[in-house]
Amino acid sequence: MNILVFSDSHGRVLDMFNLVENLSPDAVIHLGDYDEDAQDLRRSYPDLTVYSVRGNNDYGSDSPWFSVVTLEGVKFYLTHGNREGVVWTSCGNIAEHAKKFGCSIALYGHTHCANHVIDDDIHIFNSGSISLPRQGVASCLSLEIQNGKLIDAVFLNTDGEPISLTKQKNKSKFRWF
């Protein structure tokens, strides 16, 4: 099962839609900001399974602040991250929440910075921002799950090409708070 993970699209959906069209994922996860963009995916691709949570800019959204889903036998904790205290240099208490629900993978956004850490045997990924990156490269995350295991995790640019987190530099002239 291939899963595309997006966060922080902020209404700029063209790259997100192009990636879905070109990569044909089995499911999409949107981690907030803007939840309406996930709704647009659902309307445009009615046969595509789309999971979403709300972010700090999703005023009036009915989506949950977090969600726990099981895909191909792997349990995921989904959140935007703002309520778990994430910052550029820390995943906050996401590992604690994921562990409480028995999840082996936690996904979050909010910082606009792609990241992967392992904390207490839990893989914690931030897909970065598909539209307003703080690291200079807009990104999403592609996960491959088979037989109850994470087989592959690759950060992709807006063309669907793999990117290395170590090669990204903060080229933005903006400071995001």
Functional labels for PLM-detected ranges:
Residues 1-3, 68-77, 118-124, 143-152:
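Beta-strand-turn-beta hairpins that frame and shape the catalytic cleft
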Residues 1-48, 58-60, 64-65, 137-139, ...:
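N-terminal active-site segment of His-dependent metallophosphoesterases
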Residues 5-7, 27-33, 51-56, 78-80, ...:
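Active-site neighborhood of phospho(di)ester-bond hydrolases with catalytic His/Asp-centered motifs
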Residues 9, 56, 82-84, 130, ...:
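Short, solvent-exposed coil/turn elements at secondary-structure transition points
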Residues 11, 15, 36, 59, ...:
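Short, electropositive, low-hydrophobicity segments enriched in small/polar residues
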Residues 15, 99-101, 125-177:
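Binuclear metal-dependent phosphoesterase catalytic core
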Residues 23, 27, 38-40, 60-118, ...:
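His/acidic metal-ligating clusters that form di-metal
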Residues 40-52, 116-132:
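Short acidic, glycine/proline-enriched helix-loop-strand junctions
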